[in-house]
Regions:
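C-terminal catalytic region of ATP-dependent kinase domains
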Residues: 1-27, 164-385
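Hydrophobic residue at the +6 position relative to the catalytic HRD Asp in the kinase catalytic loop
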Residues: 156-158
Length: 385
């Protein structure tokens, strides 16, 4: 009976209210912004469908969604993505210096609390002879992300579109190294400035005691059968249906340039390195000029960027416990599960307090800063430090 699970009842009620509020907000924004969408993205016709659930939830249940119109579909994101346009301006400036430097950033219409992006569909290469060009462009993209302090660009954040790898989420750009009194700033700086921080490159998988062993990088992450252990439904379509521990496939994403994913990457390392080197050297020379420095300042000053204190998987593992029936009976039990977050002794305890507050709403915690201030604030607008 539902009375046995008062926490579940509360969660359903709150989730329904948040969903209703978010849905009304989306429709209101669409009504106000549609003329701009018609002009900038060429939208025509009526809205036929909305697909929710693309990505994690933040900001009290808000998530990325796809809007389907008569002749097109676009991505709606409940956040300010002016950073896309700023980075695109810089990328286009560099391309004018050398036309072989191509970086595609989705066209974006950004508002203070929401944005629209063009939908980038997966377009695998028909001929493998184009792979050298693809991996040259991947090297260019890696250098771009690295030089602008990008991180957490895993396989879900990159779409292969012909000979172009296209990143579809730039909110983790312009990251700053975090300070930890116990670890030491020198070690953290060394780790931060490694190119592997971007997650675009293979990291030999994630090997943990729970059996997870998959490659998450945007370069190589693809389908793997029986990749890890987890809860699976068995005895489907019977009265004995239940969850049990079993093997789960890792589905991969749309990040590989060929559909079958069978690529001997070693053949293209030379192209990859050349792309990285070409962009790096061009950027190095441009950065000696006052014009380019002014361009960077004009486009990067005052941008809202995300701050990462933990990887998303760490939060997701805690949330998975909160979904267990045992944690739907007493709210105190949920608080005990959230206590695990305090095991990481951040020097600023306000970080963990905010993480707990956001995860009580079953959101992935999120924090922000602006490029012109030395402060961090959370999704509720609370200043953390």
């Amino acid at each position: 009976p539902i009375n046995k699970y008062p926490v579940l009842l509360r969660q359903i009620s709150e989730s329904c209210l948040r969903f209703y509020t978010y849905f009304i907000e989306i429709l209101s924004n669409l009504e106000n912004d549609f003329s701009v969408l018609e002009e900038e993205l060429g939208l025509r016709g009526k809205l036929n469908d909305i697909k929710f659930g693309k990505g994690d939830t933040h900001s009290q249940g808000k998530t990325v969604l796809i809007l389907f119109f008569d002749d097109a579909k676009i991505v709606y994101k409940p956040k300010n993505l002016i950073i896309n346009n700023s980075l695109n301006t810089i990328a286009e400036y560099i391309r004018k210096v050398d036309e072989k430097i191509r970086i595609r950033i989705p066209r974006t219409i950004a508002y203070s609390d929401h944005s629209y992006e063009e939908f980038i569909d997966y377009l695998p290469l028909e001929q493998k002879k184009k792979l050298p060009e693809y991996y040259y462009n991947f090297g260019v993209l890696l250098a771009f992300i690295y030089l602008f302090n990008g991180s957490d660009i895993h396989f879900e954040n990159l779409i292969s579109y012909g000979d172009m790898p296209v990143i579809i989420d730039f909110e983790t750009m312009l990251q700053q190294p975090l300070f930890d009194d116990k670890t030491g700033q020198s070690l953290l700086d060394t780790l931060f400035h490694r190119v592997t921080r971007t997650l675009l490159l293979p990291t030999e998988g994630v090997k943990r005691e729970d059996g997870l062993d998959v490659e998450m990088s945007a370069l190589t992450g693809n389908f793997k059968k029986d990749a890890f252990n987890g809860q699976v439904l068995i005895n489907l379509n019977t009265d004995k249906v239940k969850f049990d521990i079993g093997k789960i496939d890792f589905e991969g994403g749309k990040n590989l340039p060929v559909r079958d994913g069978d690529i001997e990457f070693d053949k293209y390392i030379k192209d990859f390195k050349k792309g990285f080197r070409d962009f790096y050297l061009i950027f190095e020379e441009l950065n000696k000029t006052e014009e380019f420095k002014m361009l960077l300042k004009a486009n990067l000053y005052g941008l809202k960027t995300r701050v990462l204190f933990r990887d998303t998987n760490s939060y997701a593992s805690v949330l998975s416990f909160l979904y267990h029936p045992d944690f739907y009976e007493e709210m105190l039990d949920r608080e005990k599960a959230l206590e695990n977050l305090w095991s990481n002794k951040f020097s600023n305890q306000g970080i963990v307090a905010s993480e707990c507050e956001q995860m009580r709403l079953l959101d992935i915690p999120i924090f922000y800063t602006d490029t012109n201030i030395n402060e961090i604030y959370d999704d509720f607008g609370n200043h953390i430090g």
